[in-house]
Amino acid sequence: MARMRVMVRERIDGVRPDTLWFLSHPPVYTVGKRTPPEHRPLAGLGIPVHETNRGGLLTYHAPGQLVGYVMCHIGAMNAVVPFLRLLEARLVDTVEALGIPAERRDTPPGSVELTGVWTRRTNRKIASIGLRCTRKVTSHGFALNVDCDMRPWTWATPCGMPEVEMTSVQRELTDAGHAVPSMAEVREIAAEMLGARNAPHPPAPNLSSGDLGTGTRAGRT
């Protein structure tokens, strides 16, 4: 988180271009600012719970999950929701490029937010999104389940939805009888769909044209 905060400050100060940082975390639950206590995992599971300042509720990170932190200057604070919808669309493109029919969903009035990416064939959630915006620069980002251990998802309430079934690229493709790509292959497809490549400082993303902006991949750790 400290490194992400440095990147955000650099983007605010104009010394860093829009950046997509791929990484993975050791097993950890992270909770957004509005996560109720009853959605947290029971004590004694051996998996830490980390408080964050992002939007969204509880999510789980682990090896085998592709996490992408997105530090983008979006031009205006009221562009956060359009940017989030654009990010969802690019992740849908990523999942479909892997051979899994996918979709984003609109949230009905009064419902828990359905932000993220869902599988159309099996009605499961495969990617989660949680963003924060500081002085027109986004932080945090998304998590795409590739081949991680899915059991810890059942030990808490993911995304505020007790009934949701989480899934992974591995599960969906294996169940359909297809080969499972490596993490490196998934990473390259995600980078392509998100428009991440080494580039000079870009303009703010053109939300009306569906452009996330020309980003730089900050590497993977």
UniProtKB/Swiss-Prot annotation:
Reaction(s) the record says it catalyses: octanoyl-[ACP] + L-lysyl-[protein] = N(6)-octanoyl-L-lysyl-[protein] + holo-[ACP] + H(+)
Residues annotated as the enzyme's active site: 159
Example GO biological process: protein modification process
Sorted UniProt keywords: Acyltransferase, Cytoplasm, Transferase
Record's signal peptide: none
Domain BPL/LPL catalytic: 14-202
Entry's localization field: Cytoplasm
Pathway membership, UniProt: Protein modification; protein lipoylation via endogenous pathway; protein N(6)-(lipoyl)lysine from octanoyl-[acyl-carrier-protein]: step 1/2
GO cellular component assignments: cytoplasm
Enzyme Commission code(s) on record: 2.3.1.181
Chain segments carrying region Disordered: 197-221
Domain of life: Bacteria
Marked site: Lowers pKa of active site Cys: 125
Molecular function (Gene Ontology), one example: lipoyl(octanoyl) transferase activity
PANTHER family: LIPOYLTRANSFERASE 2, MITOCHONDRIAL-RELATED (PTHR10993:SF7), OCTANOYLTRANSFERASE (PTHR10993)
Additional facts recorded: In the reaction, the free carboxyl group of octanoic acid is attached via an amide linkage to the epsilon-amino group of a specific lysine residue of lipoyl domains of lipoate-dependent enzymes.
NCBIfam families: lipB
Protein name listed in UniProt: Octanoyltransferase
